[in-house]
Amino acid sequence: DYIVEAIEAEGGVVFAKSNTPEFEAGANTFNEVFGRTLNPWNLSRSAGGSSGGAAVAVATGMAFVAQGSDFACSLRYPAAFCNVVGLRPTPGVVPQ
């Protein structure tokens, strides 16, 4: 993975994989293996999808930064739901 290699080349440590929905797409972060990812500020609400696990990890302090994709706002929605910043790079700047 290009992003992982770039992070490690700069001295970063990739230490975990957060929860994502099956096929990495969906309005909620849910899968049959790990279940639903809950909003850290209100457990009755969604963390959004599909990068909900990444947004929760940042919101709760488990990670300083997280990487995800933004197909159909799947990075920006979880960021907004979990009150963290989600940045969508300019298309073509970050290899897919």
Where are these regions (language model features)?
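Glycine-rich, flexible loop motifs
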Residues: 87
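Short glycine-enriched loops at secondary-structure junctions
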Residues: 19-21, 90-93
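Gly/Ser-rich catalytic/binding loops embedded in alpha/beta enzyme cores
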Residues: 1-72
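A short core secondary-structure module
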Residues: 66, 91-96
